[in-house]
């Protein structure tokens, strides 16, 4: 199973740790980088402003993604050094440093390292560490968002294998990028270690800077009458600016911004196959069924006639950005009439909404609200507390068996922005749900209630398309513990 969760779920065995960090010369090259007029992508702008605000308030920002897996043998430090530098030099998402003009949060300045050969990551031996020390090390040695080198790499050596990890600020990567890092590092290192070649020969990948330029060019062409803008305006009106959030209390995170994850099994292998069959029969795909179940679960707590939600969509352009590391994922709106719907009706509506919303992925909601002007006065863009429901079919990842064999996982730092996010993942032999939330008693109780409703929604999707309401409500409001919950 591909792992997804909190850093506490990462269990590297004890061993000597080597970490690759930017050399002093590379950091100097970033500080002296040429100022660029290219505006960062909207995804980056949101994250940079959140980092600036958190820093000004003296708070920590949830930001780090730890990508880790196992590799056989004794790590060849020379080969790994060449691999890491080749990876960083060929992905220009790593080549930019951002700061704010005279401390003003409205003006983001990009400084560029024009010559990738100036980037040099060098290994440092940190000695033997146990599991907890390794996790702390991976988090604390990676610089903050507003520093250029907010990405580090490392290995933990064992008797017959080693653990590789990348600790990267979300500024530079999204969920898909985690898999790209795996393929880049794993395959390049294996080639160098086995061939004895001195340098990695890495093919060219598309520029993330080019993506940002295309994004802003597209946004500049939008007008109030653009269909995508009108769709965002309609969604904002329908929600009255009360953007989708978790339907139950989670407490305030201003005092305690610790975060955690839970993972539960939704369906076993047979149940997963049956769920797909039910979705097909309803005229939907698996993704539509997933969103329908999320709508049904939320309905138990809100009672609203229509579900409004956000889901993630990858904006990479096929054959252009498919292998590019960067933050491409964006949120799109989902609308599902749910009050009197059967599962089949809800699944069809969710699928249609998802398919229609894909065109909105390239249109930042911030720009739509700007164009709407007085029509939506007083409505602000979604905050970090907006809830996302994401679906991933891990079976469709190229060479998915390699992920399984290597124990691949993606882990987040143990911080929270106060919101709740949900990932529903189809594994080789089951379907799981992973949910992130503030680490406090109120949020934990609410998450247990929500997951109970979600589990029952999936169960009744495969067993019956009617009569789910009473049973889901009964389970959602019970004090029963959840089976199969893992941290």
Annotated model-derived regions:
Residues 97-98, 189-206, 233-244, 446-487:
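A short N-terminal helical cap/helix-turn-helix that marks the beginning
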Residues 77-88, 139, 182-186, 276, ...:
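Short amphipathic alpha-helical segments
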Residues 1-56, 82-126, 204-259, 481-487:
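Short amphipathic alpha-helices and their capping loops
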Residues 98-102, 155-159, 424-428:
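Short, low-complexity Ser/Thr-rich regulatory SLiMs
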Residues 1-50, 54-63, 95, 199, ...:
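Acyl-thioester-dependent acyl-group transfer interface
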Residues 24-40, 59-79, 145-166, 251-316, ...:
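Gly/Ser/Thr-rich phosphate-binding loops and adjoining beta-strand/alpha-helix segments
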Residues 2-12, 126-129, 137, 145-147, ...:
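Active-site-proximal acidic secondary-structure segment that organizes catalysis
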